UniProtKB/Swiss-Prot annotation:
InterPro entries: CRAL-TRIO_dom, CRAL-TRIO_dom_sf, CRAL/TRIO_N_dom, CRAL/TRIO_N_dom_sf, Sfh5. Residues 198-378 form the CRAL-TRIO domain. This is Phosphatidylinositol transfer protein SFH5. The lineage of its organism: Eukaryota, Fungi, Dikarya, Ascomycota, Pezizomycotina. It is a peripheral membrane protein. It comes from Ajellomyces capsulatus (strain NAm1 / WU24). The gene is SFH5. CDD domains: SEC14. GO terms for molecular function: metal ion binding; phosphatidylinositol transfer activity. Heme binds at residues 229, 249, 283, 285, 319.
């Protein structure tokens, strides 16, 4: 090797060593070829270094990779720079509400029922109230049992309608018809006035009916009506005028209804539960023996039942028939025709009235004749206003022309009118007529005045 080639070869070896290429063969080459290879090796080393650096970054991302946040803003620089489209956003929200996931299966929201529970849970009662205004207009009357009928927010009104609806087993049409008839009847009869202002014949109705209140530890005040039919002295006189009897009976009933205080109610009756606004009735048939045969009493009884079943529904809690004789079977038969099965179940016949007190926890408060310890009804109970009947005038004496001549008559003209022509012939033979004036202390009266004399006055 010449001296000239040595420096060139040494420089090439140094360049290869600096580039880290240990695989370059140490072979003598032509100077030009060697120089080209050196240049190529240098270029390869320069290219490979960045690739190795990239591989290192891939192998150690947590150490050498730049933070992700640094490259994120370059994703969509144009979109982030634009202002938001408000209309588009609102349209997109509306579309999501209508077409969002699960929108087809989502049930529609029902409006909240703000009505009272007694209406929301009782569609029949709610329907009944919808018809109330029309009923009141047709009847032209709005008072029932002392309650002025208003609307579904008025508790006393609600209780009245519940009673009519229950009496008709939830049938709104029947309840509507009955309420209308009852209102029309009250307008015609004015039962409040019958109870508060009218008076009734004592000779017909004294001792026949009473109203009394007793205290029950659980229920509070219990209202009783008593009908004592054994006190009737003259059946034809008491029951003969059916209208008068019904008015008396209605007056007694209105007294009891007033004691129930329906107009002061503050809580609604439980439609399917107990009703605190009801009374107990007692009918006493002690010594009654006329009800089977007397058609007048049968007529009065049937008409009374008809009126009460229409005008006073659901006011009866229980009804006791005490001292009932066997012949009273027709009464219960009649009741079954006019009243519902629910009402019939409230009836209790008792043969011996003394056993009545056993039916109640307040037995001692009942009169002694019914098994209690209290005074009899005449002293312990109330009744309707009675009036003393004006004594009827005694029958007038018959006119002298039609009557037999009195034995003490001294009026000759009266004798002449009364006697026949044959008796006139014997008139002169009768000395008594001449002596008669001495027996009379009163002055003679004209014959015409004798028609106004009573039998006792004539005898004087």
């Amino acid at each position: 090797m010449s001296e000239t080639e040595k420096p060139v070869q040494a420089a090439a070896a140094a360049a290869v060593a600096a580039a880290g290429t240990a695989d370059v063969p140490a072979v003598e080459k032509d100077p030009e070829t060697t120089q080209d290879k050196q240049q190529s090796a240098t270029d390869n080393s320069t290219t490979k270094a960045p690739q190795d650096e990239k591989n290192k970054q891939t192998e150690n991302p947590s150490t050498d990779a730049p933070p992700a946040a640094a490259t994120a803003p370059t994703a969509d620089p144009i979109t982030s720079a634009q202002p938001p489209d408000v209309d588009a956003i609102e349209a997109q929200k509306d579309g999501q509400k209508k077409n969002g996931p699960g929108s087809e299966n989502k049930p529609d929201e029902t409006p909240v029922d703000t009505r009272p529970e007694y209406l929301s849970k009782n569609p029949a009662l709610s329907e009944f109230f919808e018809k109330l205004a029309s009923i009141l207009k047709k009847a032209d009357h709005n008072e029932m049992w002392g309650v002025t009928l208003k609307d579904s927010d008025d508790v006393p009104t609600v209780n009245v309608l519940i009673k009519f609806l229950r009496a008709n087993e939830g049938n709104v049409k029947l309840a509507e018809e009955q309420l209308r008839k009852a209102l029309e009847w009250r307008k015609k009869m004015n039962p409040l006035a019958l109870a508060e202002k009218a008076t009734y014949s004592s000779s017909k109705f004294q001792g026949l009916g009473y109203v009394a209140n007793y205290k029950d530890q659980n229920q509070g005040k219990v209202v009783f009506t008593w009908n004592i039919y054994g006190s009737v002295k003259d059946a034809n006189r008491t029951f003969g005028d059916v209208d008068e009897f019904i008015k008396w009976r209605v007056a007694l009933m209105e007294m009891a209804v007033k004691d129930l205080k329906l107009s002061e109610a503050t809580s609604v009756i439980d439609y399917s539960g107990e009703d605190p606004y009801q009374m107990i009735q007692v009918h006493d048939y002690q010594n009654v023996s006329f009800l089977r045969l007397n058609p007048t009493i049968k007529s009065a009884t049937k008409q009374t039942i008809d009126v009460f079943s229409t005008a006073y529904p659901e006011l009866l809690k229980e009804k006791f028939f005490v001292n009932v004789p066997a012949l009273m079977g027709w009464v219960f038969t009649a009741l079954k025709v006019f009243l519902s099965k629910n009402t019939i179940r409230k009836f209790h016949p008792i043969t011996n009235g003394v056993n009545l007190a056993r039916e109640f926890s307040f037995a001692d408060e009942l009169p002694k004749s019914y098994g209690g310890k209290a005074d009899e009804l005449a002293e312990s109970a109330r009744t309707v206003a009675l009036r003393q009947d004006t004594p009827e005038p005694p029958p007038e004496s018959a006119p002298p022309a039609q009557a037999s001549p009195p034995t003490t008559e001294t009026n000759g003209s009266a004798k002449e009118v009364a006697k026949t022509a044959a008796e006139d012939a014997k008139k002169a033979e009768a000395p008594v007529a001449a002596d008669a004036p001495a027996t009379i202390s009163e002055p003679e009266k004209p014959a015409a005045s004798s028609a106004n004399e009573t039998p006792s006055e004539v005898a004087k």
